Structures are given as structure tokens and as C-alpha cells.
From Swiss-Prot:
CDD domains: Kunitz_textilinin-like (cd22594)
SS bond partners: C31-C81, C40-C64, C56-C77
Site (Reactive bond for chymotrypsin): M41, G42
Name listed for the protein in its UniProt record: Kunitz-type serine protease inhibitor vestiginin-5
GO molecular function: serine-type endopeptidase inhibitor activity
Annotated family: Belongs to the venom Kunitz-type family.
Signal peptide positions on this chain: 1-24
Localization (cell): Secreted
Source lineage: Eukaryota, Metazoa, Chordata, Craniata, Vertebrata
Keyword Signal set for record: yes
GO cellular component, one term: extracellular space
Function comment: Serine protease inhibitor.
Annotated SMART domains: KU
Amino acid sequence: MSSGGLLLLLGLLTLWAELTPVSSKDRPEFCELPPDRGTCMGFLQAFYYNPSQKGCLPFMFGGCKANPNNFKTLEECKRTCAA
């Protein structure tokens, strides 16, 4: 196989690994925590994993001292917690 073909294969495998959902057995335990607004008074949109709905949902984050089930983007939440 040519080096171009190997690079293409490597790229496709990397893409597949990034898009493959996290299985529930591999999901970090913090994904089960409820959304935590934190102790600050800001109004920042963040995302958390909701285990009963098996998906990521938005919530208002205060800006500091929240639990780890808190993501800046929907994509980051899905990549980390969604099955």
C-alpha cells in the first residue's frame, strides 16, 4: 500500500474513533452527577450529561466551582459521556 493510502487509512480510523460513542461501561462516573450551577453568579450556557435521558442537555452555569459533569460545548459532553 502506498504512503498516501496508509495516511488515508490512518485518517479514517482516527475519525471513526472520534465519532464512536462512549459505551456505558466506559463512561466516567462523574457523568452520573446532577447539573451543578456552581457558587458564582454568572449566566453561562454549559452542558451536562443526563443519564435518564441518555443525552447531553444545556443548563446555566454560574462560572466557577461546579462538579465535573459540566462541559463548555455539546460536542465535548457527547464525546465524554454520551452512549
